[in-house]
Amino acid sequence: MNSSIGKFFVAACLLLGGLLYFTWMHFLDDFYRQQIPAEVEVGAMLYADSGIRGGCGSAIFALGPRSKAQLVLSGKRALAGARLESVDERGPGISKDWKETPYIYRDKEFRAESYWSTLSCSWISRTRYDTIMGALDKPGSFFRQYKEGVTLVIPSADLVVYLFF
């Protein structure tokens, strides 16, 4: 009898843990999607992680096929109206416009201290890290900086990356 109660308890704990995990992942998916302008069509969330205290992190989505086609056809013009009302756009070096890569590091800005360094807060795979950092060095990707985050759209890799700090 005690054995069946123990098995039931373990099964109930596993079920509850699974439900909590999927609820948390759904919350993160929804929260991070709100940080991407609606004009940038995103598919499935491929990755999300933040530092131990949540001070920095990243979310990576698949780029939707319509957005990719528009970006390939029109370039940065496809993002002309892409705005977020919920983010703070004030501060030094922050522009309300989307920019095309390559990313030009500002005077005295070290790569390790740039917007892109928040990738190191996440347990991102080396290949995905190289894809994102490589996209910053060549033309064809688009980014928009906010006071506490940045969105990077990489059509060549079918990725949309949101970094926050």
Task: Put a short name on every predicted segment.
Residues 1-17:
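N-terminal Sec-pathway targeting helices
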Residues 9-10, 32, 143:
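Compositionally biased, low-structure terminal segments
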